[in-house]
Amino acid sequence: MRYLRPIPKRLLTDDMLVWPSDGEGGFDAVRMVRHVRFEREEQLCGDAHRSADGGHGRVFVDAVSSAGAFEIPAGSRVLVGDNPSMVVESCKRCCVIRGSVHHWELVVR
């Protein structure tokens, strides 16, 4: 598997605003990343009448198909679609065999 195709744009239906963490507790200037995918993770509470906050999940950013893509540092704040803003807990770089980045997976809360 020497080459892996980019994630098709038809699957990347969301746009995302990013306030990158500056590493000192603040944020750098806002950046737009178009064509990302947000997959929400629903969690159930012990109370059978309600569910937990739906603002958790994963964001997939393709290195080729996502316009403005970059490696988003943990601690950054993101706004995807009409969801509330979320904080990036981790950013996993997914590479092809030759070491180039195929996509990033962000865990957001």
Range-by-range predicted roles:
Residues 1-30:
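Active-site-proximal polar cores
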